[in-house]
Regions:
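Carboxylate-rich, polar loop motifs that coordinate divalent cations or form catalytic acidic clusters
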Residues: 1-407
Length: 407
């Protein structure tokens, strides 16, 4: 086997939190390996009310709260908020949404957009003064590196240098309670907009306009649209449940309603607002108003996964769920949140006993790293650096001594 240590970028995490999680993932021989832990930095947050989360291109986890911005680097949390020393650091400390381009993290608040320079973490206001002092509902940097910013009832489209291309004013009627819920780019580069009370829209690039779709449910209130790994579309609504969406079908076959029943409340769940699909089991994880749900897709329909055996409270007041680049999930909530680690089923459950046989004494893993080539780097105390090939279920030694690798 060629020496992977010279050709692989390695992400190493020395946090004891992750080491404990790895050991827990090797306990059960039958259960699916999903481990839920409280977010490890809650006491450092400016507020436990986590509104939105984002993992940037460098791997940092950003958290938007009602009282400031946090950046987690795997060890500790750095906070950004206006105070008496820096009264205008952010245009507003109530963080609502994120987007990211090659140079900046874009932070949406109740008072416009802030640009966080990723090279030095200097913060400045977004140059378009028309949207400052405005609640930013949602933002998207698309595959063409163009920016879309949604405010109450309009969408603003920008070039990559933040110059305005076009403002789509009054996309929906400016009546009380109407607004833009979200904007989304699918796998084919199509841009979709979900609106409160105004229905679903698709951007038509050839005419530079938005096309509306037929009324959805009784309230015509799509909250999020999502395309799964098999390119199937799902629409989460606020008030009418979840629909399978067939964009090219006739109007009478365009929306297929999914029956989602809340056993605890003995009634259908009708309001949904955040969605992601994990890479390990292919479950679609969705936040409902009352509960966190996980679904399998079978014959084009959602089948509920029983989460009752997992040790976490899935009835929290959740806010946003995201997937990090290691395939694990982060679930923000208005009263803290969870880090859901998706155990790779390719890793044998007797990993630790095998390692003990390999080294000849008790295992004591002090450092873990995730290898993008489907493996794990780790340091075994009194042995040294090792690499575990998940596909081949083999260990490889990379230390010339048995003294170990010290942090």
């Amino acid at each position: 086997m060629e020496n992977r240590i010279h050709r692989t970028e390695i992400q190493i995490y020395v946090s004891p939190f992750l080491i404990v999680i790895f050991l827990l993932m090797s306990i059960s021989s039958n259960a699916q390996q999903i481990i839920a832990k409280q977010m490890p930095f809650l006491e450092q947050l400016p507020s436990n009310e986590v509104i939105d989360l984002h993992q940037d291109q460098n791997g940092f986890i950003w958290l938007g709260t009602k009282n400031g911005l946090g950046r987690y680097d795997g060890y500790q949390l750095q906070t950004f908020k206006s105070d008496f020393n820096q009264p205008h650091l952010l245009t507003d400390d109530f963080i609502w949404c994120f987007a990211e381009d090659d140079n900046c993290l874009l932070v949406g608040t109740r008072q416009g957009v802030n640009l966080v320079d990723k090279s030095n973490y200097q913060i400045r206001p977004f140059p378009d003064t028309e949207i400052q002092n405005t609640w930013i509902n949602f933002m998207l940097v698309d595959s063409r590196k163009e920016l879309w910013i949604c405010t109450r009832n309009q969408v603003s489209h920008y070039n990559s240098d933040y110059s305005l291309k076009k403002r789509y004013g009054n996309l929906i009627p400016a009546v009380p309670n109407n607004g833009i819920n979200s904007i989304y780019e699918d796998h084919f580069g199509n841009i979709w907009v979900c609106t409160w009370g105004g229905g679903l829209y698709k951007y038509l690039k050839n005419t530079d306009t938005f096309m509306s779709f037929p009324t959805l449910g009784a309230n015509n209130n799509p909250f999020k649209i999502f395309q799964d790994k098999d390119d199937q579309y799902w629409i989460l609504t606020w008030g009418d449940g979840i629909y399978r969406f067939h964009p090219d079908a006739t109007e009478d076959r365009m929306y297929t309603h999914q029956e989602i029943f809340n056993e605890k409340l003995h009634q259908p769940e009708t309001a949904f607002f955040s969605v992601v699909q994990d890479d390990v089991y292919g479950y679609i994880w969705i936040f409902g108003y009352h509960e966190l749900y996980a679904f399998k897709v079978a014959d084009g329909h959602l089948e509920k996964v029983d989460l009752s055996s997992y040790m976490f409270d899935y009835n929290k007041m959740f806010s946003q769920i995201i997937k990090d680049r290691e395939g694990n999930l982060w679930a923000g909530a208005y009263d803290s949140g969870y880090h859901l680690l998706m155990g790779n089923p390719a890793i044998a459950n007797n990993f630790l006993p095998k390692l003990k046989r390999h080294v000849g004494f008790d295992t004591n893993i002090t450092t873990l790293g995730i290898d993008p080539n489907n493996g794990l780097w780790f340091n075994q105390e009194r042995w040294g650096l090792c690499w575990y090939d998940i596909e081949q279920d083999k260990f490889y030694d990379y230390s010339n001594t048995n003294s170990g690798v010290h942090n």
